[in-house]
Regions:
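N-terminal low-complexity, intrinsically disordered segments
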Residues: 2-7, 87-95, 202-205, 212, ...
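Aromatic- and glycine-enriched beta-alpha-beta binding-site module
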Residues: 84-145
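Compact, glycine/acidic-enriched structural inserts
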Residues: 120-179
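Charge-rich, low-complexity terminal tails
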Residues: 183-236
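Extended cationic-aromatic binding surfaces that line active-site or macromolecule-binding grooves
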Residues: 49-105
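Aromatic/basic-lined ligand-recognition segments
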Residues: 81, 173-186
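Acidic, low-complexity proline/glycine-rich segments
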Residues: 2-21, 188
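Contiguous, amphipathic alpha-helical segments that mediate oligomerization or scaffolding
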Residues: 20, 26-65, 216-235
Length: 236
């Protein structure tokens, strides 16, 4: 078990790897400089290895209902911890979170996948298709209009709506150009991306069975992913 070093304003229990990960991330959010990082490199190596094991376990859990996921390697889902500061006013060299985007098509694919984000006070799960190019985005919207009954049966299902009440992170103010202004469900074609997320308290990840629970959430999300991904498949 990783031992945490409680040097930040936030203090986590030291009896599980998830708490040690969050403790480290809380610490580096305060001491976000290269000297501190290198002085605590052993801690980083330990918590990052623990996060890789978490992702491996999550891949196994998702593979039960999404067999394509079994082919995904842990490394392919992870992101660099160093920040790209070239165009940012924030020159902090390191991120304040660990993230994993589990997508059999790869992180850079337009296809949607499953996302896990660990960050003190801002942990979440999510998924869907981000940063879609305009023609693909239009195709997804068009498919929603053409198959609105199927789409509504997915996103208005009580289990889904309870976890993911909002589709998309940013939205147009009006119906997109080229679509019927009288379409009765404009909220489903106004999103600028087709992603969903569900925030979770830090303490959620201290429970032994949290990966099983998150896998259940992702299973509920899968029909939404399938709808979006099938449209992308048809377009590409």
């Amino acid at each position: 078990m990783i031992k945490s070093c409680e040097t930040s304003l936030k203090s986590y229990p030291n009896d599980c790897d998830e708490a040690s990960i969050l403790q480290y991330l809380a610490d580096i959010s305060i001491h976000n400089n290269r000297d501190w990082f290198h002085e605590n490199k052993d801690r980083y190596d330990e918590v990052h290895a623990a996060f890789e094991q978490i992702v491996s376990n999550l891949i196994d859990a998702l593979s039960v209902f999404d067999p394509e996921i079994s082919l995904v390697s842990v490394k392919s889902t992870l992101y660099r911890f160093n920040r790209d500061t070239r165009f940012s006013p924030d020159k902090s060299p390191y991120k304040r979170h660990f993230g994993s985007y589990i997508n059999p098509k790869g992180k850079k694919s337009p296809h949607g996948g499953y996302y896990l984000h660990l960050q003190p006070g801002n942990c979440l799960i999510g998924g869907g298709a981000y940063c879609l190019e305009s023609p693909i985005l239009k195709a997804v919207r068009r498919n929603i209009v053409d198959d609105i009954d199927e789409f509504r049966s997915i996103v208005e299902a009580p289990e889904f709506k309870n976890l993911f009440p909002v589709i998309g992170e940013d939205h147009l103010k009006t119906v997109p150009v080229g679509f019927d202004r009288n379409f009765p469900y404009p909220q489903y074609i106004r999103p600028k991306n087709f992603a969903v997320m569900h925030k979770l308290p830090d303490e959620f990840f201290f429970n032994e069975g949290w990966i099983t629970e998150v896998a259940k959430y992702f299973k509920i999300m899968k029909p939404f992913l399938d709808f979006v991904n099938h449209t992308i498949d048809d377009y590409i």
